[in-house]
Every structure is written in structure tokens, then in C-alpha cells.
Amino acid sequence: MSLSRVSVTAVRNLHPVTFSPSPRINLLYGANGSGKTSVLEAIHLLGLARSFRSARLLPVIQYEQLACTVFGQVELAQGGHSSLGISRDRQGEFQIRIDGQNARSAAQLAEILPLQLINPDSFRLLEGAPKIRRQFLDWGVFHVEPRFMSTWQRLQKALRQRNSWLRHGTLDAASQAAWDRELCQASAEIDEYRRAYIKALKPVFERTLGELLQLEGLTLSYYRGWDKDRELSEVLATALHRDQQMGHTQAGPQRADLRLRLGGHNAADILSRGQQKLVVCALRIAQGHLVSQARRGQCIYLVDDLPSELDEQHRRALCRLLEDLRCQVFITCVDHELLREGWQTETPVALFHVEQGRITQTHDHRE
């Protein structure tokens, strides 16, 4: 799948624009502060209903504008196309439209437009809190396991009920036992989906990383959020008094983590920033392969400031892997000459110059 048309209005410093990207490689170049990253942010907003630059969306809306909007036409893997639109106003109201109809949730956008982001903050996947790695893991499971979303919703509902009971004790024992059974059942299913996903991801990740970097002894493992040798029901019963003191459930899928270790140490403590970037790239490219293998289409990659922290050899290796995915890629850089060469002659490459919020196409992929 790919975006064949994108329209952006009132997103940060961008002037209103409609452009037609290449179905494969798109290079957006220009000086720092010109608006290149804002273009990626607009696409990210269209696919996930959130920004990767700010936890709050108010700063995304252009000064003195009432709302920001992004529209896109998606060419679907199975043929045909889908029209997506999202608008967010200063009062925090969202409107999501899919093929002219109001959509209920951002998950519907994500299913149609699977996005992968690689940017200068990507190292946080290794250095950041477990929540970031759970989001990475669950993004992958969501796109390959059709049962994941409904099970996840069951889990969240049961977890909210238990946490409320821990804080306020508002349920009778029989009702709480029923919610605990639901929590344990949904947790077991989520753990099963995650475990199967990691089993599929590991060999693809290792192969992909080998194309980018030689790191002997790097291991990827999955911690499910509670003792692997005990049932969750037993763990919850044992920890009940402490959970009541804390006011929340301390064991379960909401505590899961991915662990990358090198020589017995946390990999993030040993690897350079450039090496961390390549490890994260390998993880995200491996996810793209699994989406394709599941016949769910292809990911769209948003790569912000690709040349940073990478030498020419590693830049070329990363570009080759992205090209081999045969998916749509948007790459920002200051100097497009660093990335313009090296693509296969049959790969459509489009160039867009971004200057003071204006986007001008300087090379059409059809030429």
C-alpha cells in the first residue's frame, strides 16, 4: 500500500499543500527548520492520530488557525483505494473520516495505514521505559494477529475493574473473582500472541541486523510481565496485599518488556548512538517484513534525518534494506546529494524541496 496523494492544512509552519508522492522512495530536502519534519508529522497524524514530536497536539495546529487537517488517498495492497482524513481543533476535538464515513477510533486508521517511524529519537526504543518497547511489540502484533485488538480491549477493561477495586473495594468478592478470571484469560491470550510474534521476529531481526552491523552476542528476549513458571492467577493472589497498598496491579501483560542484551549487559549501555540507531532500524525493518508476510500490505516508512549519526557505508546499507522492502518511504535530509544516488534504476524516486513551509517537487518519479 502507499499514499498516492497527501493534502495538509495548518500543520505547524507548512503552507497549505497537496502533493503526489512516489509509491516507493521520496526524498524531502531543505535547510533545518524548513518544514521537512512537519511533513512527516502530518503523515504520522493521518495514520496514528498523534504526533511523534509532541505529546500534546495543540502545538501542531498552526498559529491563529482553528484546526489542522490532513487528507490522504491510500492505494491498497489488494487493489482499489481508500480515502482518509483527520482534523483536530483547538478544543481537542478529533474528526476521523474513512471513505467519507466517520470512524470510531484511531485503530481504524492504523489498520489501513501502517506507519513505521525512524528518527533521531529512535534510540529511546532501547534506552527508554518498557512502555515504549511494549508499544513497539503491540504495534507488530496488531498488524499480524486479527484477534489482538478485541483481546486487548478485554484485558484493559478487566484491568481497570481490578485496579478500581484495589483502590476503592467497590465490588463484592464474587464479582471481583469473575473479573480476575477474565483478566487472567485475556492476559494468557495476549502473552500467546506476543510470544508467537517475537518467535517470528527474532530470525528476521537477526538477519536484517547482519546486513547493517556486525554485533556478535546481541540477544533479543521477551519478558511477559510475570514469572514464566507461575500462573498469573497465583501471582495475583500472592501479591494481593501489596497491590492493595499500591492501588494497582503490578503483574501482568501491562508490565511486559523486550530486552536486548550484549555480553550479559543492557545493550543500550554499551552501544554507541549510531549503533543503537542501526539496531532500531533493523527492528523496524524486520517488522515491515512480518507485515508483508502476513499479507497485510506493506508498511510506510517515515525516516527523519537519515544521514545523522551514520557514515556513508551504513547510510547505503540502510537505504538498500528499505528499498528491498518494496514499500513507500519518506526520507528527510538537508543535502539530498547524500541520498540521491545508489537506488536501483527501476526504483521510482521523487524529490521534494521544502523551504519556509512550502513544498516543491523537483524530480518526478515518473520522469
From Swiss-Prot:
Gene3D superfamilies: P-loop containing nucleotide triphosphate hydrolases, RecF/RecN/SMC, N-terminal domain. Pfam families: SMC_N (PF02463). This is DNA replication and repair protein RecF. ATP binds at residues 30-37. Belongs to the RecF family. Keywords: ATP-binding, Cytoplasm, DNA damage, DNA repair, DNA replication, DNA-binding, Nucleotide-binding, SOS response. The RecF protein is involved in DNA metabolism; it is required for DNA replication and normal SOS inducibility. RecF binds preferentially to single-stranded, linear DNA. It also seems to bind ATP. It comes from the Bacteria. GO terms for biological process: DNA replication; DNA synthesis involved in DNA repair; double-strand break repair; SOS response. NCBIfam families: recf. It is found in: Cytoplasm. PANTHER family: DNA REPLICATION AND REPAIR PROTEIN RECF. One of its GO terms (molecular function) is single-stranded DNA binding. Its main location: cytoplasm. It comes from Pseudomonas fluorescens (strain ATCC BAA-477 / NRRL B-23932 / Pf-5). GO terms for cellular component: cytoplasm.
